[in-house]
């Protein structure tokens, strides 16, 4: 939704397609997948499926994805889990929206999908100047990044002690991207 006008048509393709998740590693929100699609994944045991969770709060997920069915789509994860489908997850973090306590809640909730959910990465939302008609979002500051990393590292320790794995990971952007910390 943040693409500049005048680019080639293939760049505007919405890649929320389970086949692209399985074949190319794309992340899907599950919002446009039918029960038939989920049944096909289960039947053929297509793994891994990469899921963009954003949050485990159904109401907030609807708001974030601007889709009234986005919260219900989380029930599809239950079905994948029950069938033993391997999954990877990501949380695209938006400052003041799904960070802080919401992030901690989501991390706790996602543990119910262990061991099928092998890992979850937390990445900052990518912001461009092409945001017309979209929710206003602020970039993370260096201090914000430190807070996010502290939450992730805290949970990594908990999961390592409890399960022998880290499970939750910070995307490289939290460490390396100077453009992430605008205004600092």
Question: What does each model-identified segment do?
Answer:
Residues 143-184:
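Hard-cation-handling environments
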Residues 52, 123, 171:
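Conserved residues at the C-terminal ends of beta-strands
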Residues 1-116, 126-154:
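Conserved Radical SAM active-site core
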Residues 124-127, 175:
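Residue-level detector of flexible, active-site-proximal loop/helix-junction positions
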């Amino acid at each position: 939704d943040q693409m500049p006008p005048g680019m080639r048509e293939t760049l505007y393709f919405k890649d929320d397609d389970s086949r692209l998740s399985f074949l190319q590693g794309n992340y899907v929100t599950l919002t446009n997948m039918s029960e038939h699609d989920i049944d096909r994944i289960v039947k053929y045991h297509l793994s891994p499926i990469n899921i963009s969770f954003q949050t485990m709060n159904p109401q907030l997920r609807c708001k974030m994805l601007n889709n009234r069915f986005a919260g219900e789509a989380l029930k599809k994860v239950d079905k994948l889990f029950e069938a033993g489908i391997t999954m990877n997850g990501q949380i695209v973090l938006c400052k003041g929206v799904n960070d802080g306590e919401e992030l901690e809640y989501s991390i706790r909730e996602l543990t119910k999908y262990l061991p099928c959910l092998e890992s979850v990465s937390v990445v900052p939302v990518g912001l461009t100047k092409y945001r017309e008609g979209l929710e206003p979002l602020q970039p993370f500051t260096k201090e914000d990044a430190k807070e996010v990393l502290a939450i992730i590292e805290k949970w990594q320790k908990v999961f390592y002690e409890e399960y022998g794995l880290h499970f939750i990971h910070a995307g490289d952007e939290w460490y390396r991207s100077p453009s992430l910390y605008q205004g600092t």
